[in-house]
């Protein structure tokens, strides 16, 4: 990137031809000598691109507005002109042409694709027997089925756990309580005294 500028004299269009791979970024247009123009006069600035005969107006200059800013990328060949009685200056900077680099990359990519296609076409074609492929696929499917059947057998081999029924025996102490509550036939239906005090006991 470097500074770039030209002077366009009255009645003399300025033609610019860039080197390959470069372009101009124009950023400002300025009227040279304001005193040479009248207060009420307005002058137009034109640009032509390549071999195009039609020019495009990019702005107006006057004594009140002696300059204006632009943002134009101008390619390989262009021409600047105006209808002012004073010189006009166009400034900006020169930079690399990104579009040319892109075109080169596209060309290189297309060449690479063609080269790869040629190399692939030159390779011998592998002879593949479709029947062998089918057999290998069926073998793989058979292995999968065997795995599934073995899983089912494992599930069937696991017998369910048996739960023991609840015991009919009484809990500890319950039998003694029940036994103590029964009537003693030998004592006439009275409860047996737990104390060994003999026949004199009144309880």
Swiss-Prot record:
Its main location: nucleus. The keyword Cell cycle does not apply. Residues 180-193 have a biased composition (Basic residues). Residues 129-157 have a biased composition (Acidic residues). It is found in: Nucleus, Nucleolus. Keywords: Chromatin regulator, Developmental protein, Hydrolase, Nucleus, Repressor, Transcription, Transcription regulation. The keyword Metal-binding does not apply. It holds the Pfam family NPL. HDT4 is not required for the cellular patterning in the root epidermis. This is Histone deacetylase HDT4. It comes from Arabidopsis thaliana (Mouse-ear cress). The gene is HDT4.
């Amino acid at each position: 990137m470097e500074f770039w500028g030209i002077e366009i004299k009255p009645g003399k269009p300025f033609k610019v031809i860039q080197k390959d791979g470069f372009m101009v970024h124009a950023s400002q247009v300025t009227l040279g000598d304001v005193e040479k123009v009248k207060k009420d006069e307005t002058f137009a600035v034109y640009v032509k691109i390549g071999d195009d005969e039609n020019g495009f107006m990019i702005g107006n200059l006057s004594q009140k507005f002696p300059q204006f800013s632009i943002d134009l990328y101008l390619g390989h060949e262009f021409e600047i002109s105006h209808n002012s009685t004073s010189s006009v200056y166009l400034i900006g900077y020169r930079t690399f042409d990104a579009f040319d680099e892109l075109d080169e990359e596209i060309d290189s990519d297309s060449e690479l694709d063609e080269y790869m296609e040629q190399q692939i076409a030159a390779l011998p074609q592998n002879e593949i027997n479709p029947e062998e492929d089918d057999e290998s696929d069926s073998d793989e499917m058979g292995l999968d089925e065997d795995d599934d059947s073995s899983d089912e057998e494992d599930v069937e081999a696991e017998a369910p756990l048996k739960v023991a029924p609840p015991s009919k025996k009484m809990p500890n102490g319950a039998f003694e309580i029940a036994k103590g509550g029964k009537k003693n036939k030998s004592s006439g239906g009275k409860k047996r005294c737990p104390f060994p005090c003999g026949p004199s006991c009144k309880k």
